Amino acid sequence: MDTIARPLEAAAEAATHCLVDGGTVFCAGTGSDRALARYAADRLMLGAGPERPALPAVALSDPGDPAAPWREARALARPGDLLLALDSGDGSALAGALGVAAAGNPALVLLSYEGCPGLPPAGDDPIVIALPAAPRDQLLTLEAMALGCLCHLIEVNLFGS
């Protein structure tokens, strides 16, 4: 997990700036990643530890339409917001998220796996958190762990330990 420490830190910093400046974190995924996007949004809204203010976070998904999260992001996200896109599948979610970012709306954080089709090289724009490639069930577990770490880092940045 050392290989994802810096991208997680960069993603937490970007989300912190977004929230401090009055933005919203939009969490999106398709297929199995929908549940993890909901988890991330709920964790930011509700917290998992001591009482704290809710953070503006929204999960975008539609089980019947894999294009829905990206349509919703285009309609709702504004400059200063952040889109956290998850893809443990074939790269189609990455393509949708990159399309939203190309439209000039939110900052973009991609959480996927090494070798995912369409995953851009690691860098600052977008921020890429590339998990080690693994069987799908293990990859979803790694995504959940990475999201837990990301949300914790955001909370520490905003509220201290």
What are these regions (language model features)?
Residues 1-21:
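A short, well-structured juxtamembrane/interface segment
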Residues 17, 23-31:
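Glycine-rich phosphate/diphosphate-binding loops and the adjacent beta-loop-alpha structural elements
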Residues 30-160:
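Glycine-rich phosphate-binding loops that contact phosphosugars or nucleotide phosphates
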